Amino acid sequence: MGKVIAVCISEKKGTQKKNVGSARFVEDWGIQGDAHAGKWHRQVSLLSHEKVEAFRARGAVVDDGAFGENLVVEGYDFKTLPIGTKFRCGDVELELTQVGKECHSHCEIYKVMGDCIMPREGVFTRVLHGGTISARSWDNQVEFQVTLPKAGREGDFHG
């Protein structure tokens, strides 16, 4: 079982997200109040707490949300999961739609550290069923679909 460490949003695109502790997830939209919400395949982004901690151990001073992630979750290496994996936290159900992303311009973290983990460690989901998620109260079970996708290379979208 995983545990949500942080729930983060930003009201404007291009700004770091801030940990708000709890947020409302809206079906086929994303997180209420988050600038990246919308009818597309990258409604909610997830990043492994362990990957963030490993990056901090290299000397990075980063707050939760600094990489643009909505959920920081302990207990999973998200990039190893196949497209279509489903996550449940209370009433909220998310479906994995993309692993990794292309970084078009280097963020402030990259400029300071020479690296950013979000493009290779972050994953994106869409909201299948809405509700509220609060930090440190994750009771999800990862459900793998019976039929795995034919493709699933990093960055591919299957929706």
Give names to the regions the model predicted:
Residues 1-159:
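Metal-cofactor-dependent catalytic cores
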